[in-house]
Amino acid sequence: MVSATSVRNGAGFMPCQGLYHTPAGTNPKVAFIATHYNVDFSEHYLAPYLAERGYGYLGWNTRFRGNEAFLVLEHALVDIAAGVRWLYESAGVEQVVIVGNSGGGSLMGAYQSQATEPNIAATRGLRLPEAVFDLPSCDYYVSLNAHAGRPDVLTAWFDPAITDETDPASTDWSLSMFNPENGPPYSPEFVDRYRTAQFARNERLTDWCIGELARLDAAGMSDRAFNMYRTWADLRLLDGTLDPSDRPVGVCYAGDPRRANYSPRGIGLTSTCRSWLSMWSLRESHCRGEPHLRRIDVPSLVVQSTSDTGVFPSDAHAIHDALGSHDKSLEFMAGDHYLTEPDGARDEVADRISGWLDGYGI
C-alpha cells in the first residue's frame, strides 16, 4: 500500500504492507493493529490467537521494516496511519485497538499521541510532512511487554565502559559490569556511577551527531552512517536483585550477555546521524514513551510478563503510571518476552485482552 509521503518504487517495493488476520468467513467490527520500528510484524504472534477470539488483527509494517538505520519517526507515523485508515475505510472496522508490543510500544504510543494532540517536532534538518497532522486516532490502547522508549531502552542497555566508539574492544574495566571486581551483586555506588555513565554516553553520541551534521553540511553532504557497539550491558541482566522479577539471571534476548555485548549483534548497530537523533537520542528523539503516554486518554491495558529478560517490572509500572487515561489497568502474568513459555501463555494473554474488551461490550 502507498503512504501519504511515499509511493511504490521501481522495483515494486510498497512503503506499507502487512497481513490482515480474521476469523474465517467474517468481517470483524473490532480490529487490532501492531507495528514495530524495525521488526516485520505482519505475522505477529498474537494475530491468530485474537482472530480465533473473533477480532481482526492487522500486522503492519512501515517503509523502515528491516531498515531502521534510516528511520525518521514522522514518516513512520504516516505509514501507520495508512494501515489505520485501511481498517476503518476498507475493512469495515468500527473500532481499532492499538497494540504497543516490545520495541513497538513507544512507536504506537507516539502514533496515538500525535493523533490525539499533534506535538512532534521535525527531525533535525528536515520538515514535518503535512500528513503527520492528519492521523486517525484509535479507540483502545494495549501495551504488551513494551519498552519504555527507544532512547530509554538503548541507554539502559548501553555498555558505558567503551572508551572509543570506533573500537568495540576498547574498555575501561573499572566501569565494566563484566569485571568480577565490580559484581554482581553491584553496589549502590557502582550502580549510580554506571547509570550516570550510560546517560553520558547517549549525550556524547547526540553531541557528535549534531556536530557531524554541521560538518557534513559545510562539505555539501546531508548525512552519514556509523556503527554503534556494545549494547547488551544492562546491570539487571546479571544482578537479579535489581528490579527483581521471575526472570532467569545471566540471559538476554541474544543469549549470554557478555558474548552478545562483544558481538556485532545489537540494537541500533547502524544509524545515520539523523536517524540516530530521531530514534535513539535522549535529548532529541520523539521516540520516548512517557511524553506520548501522557496524551493517551482512551481505555488502556498494560500487560507484562514476569520472566521477561529485557522489560522489567519498573518499566511496566512506569508505562501504566504515565498513561493519561483515567481508565487503565496493569496486569502481570507468567511468561517470557515473546510468551513462548510457559505452555499456553499466548492463549492466556489473548484471553486477558479479550476479557478486558468484553468489559466495554465489544
Write out the residue ranges for each language-model feature:
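N-terminal cap/lid segment of alpha/beta-hydrolase-fold proteins
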Residues: 1-30, 342-343
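Primarily recognizes the serine-hydrolase "nucleophile elbow" in alpha/beta-hydrolase
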Residues: 86-89, 94-166
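Conserved alpha/beta-hydrolase "acid-adjacent" motif
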Residues: 152-153, 285, 309-315
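Alpha/beta-hydrolase
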Residues: 172-291
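Catalytic histidine-centered segment of alpha/beta-hydrolase-like enzymes
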Residues: 335-348
